[in-house]
Amino acid sequence: MMFMQQFRNLLHPAMKGARNISILAGGGTMRGFPTRNPFNTATLYSSLPTMNIFGQMQQVRWKTYGNEYQPSNRKRKRKHGFLSRIRSVNGRRVLRDRRQKGRMYLSH
């Protein structure tokens, strides 16, 4: 029934009110969709073009995520190390605050 609803959305606005596709077929044939029995929906389904519902939801991703952090001990100690903390006013403040808080490690 979900397929029927999606198919109904593709129809002309005047035809959307019809409850059954066989009514729309009007005597057994719908343009481009041959059926022997207007009430045999199995043959109507087989003659309809297949639509991949999940194909529209798939996305192609060219960007990779999660590989931004490439650890380097040299950069880490240069940025957050004890000597760099002592050199700047804000760094000395960080060391002071960590000392007051009782941290075991003041910096890297």
From Swiss-Prot:
Annotated organelle transit peptide span: 1-20
Keywords: Mitochondrion, Ribonucleoprotein, Ribosomal protein, Transit peptide
Comp. bias intervals (Basic residues): 73-82, 93-102
Top-level taxon: Eukaryota
Matching Pfam families: Ribosomal_L34
InterPro entries: Ribosomal_bL34
Cell compartment(s), UniProt: Mitochondrion
A GO cellular-component term linked to this record: mitochondrial large ribosomal subunit
Subunit relationships: Component of the mitochondrial large ribosomal subunit (mt-LSU). Mature yeast 74S mitochondrial ribosomes consist of a small (37S) and a large (54S) subunit. The 37S small subunit contains a 15S ribosomal RNA (15S mt-rRNA) and at least 32 different proteins. The 54S large subunit contains a 21S rRNA (21S mt-rRNA) and at least 45 different proteins.
Protein name, per record: Large ribosomal subunit protein bL34m
Organism: Schizosaccharomyces pombe (strain 972 / ATCC 24843)
Gene name of this polypeptide: mrx14
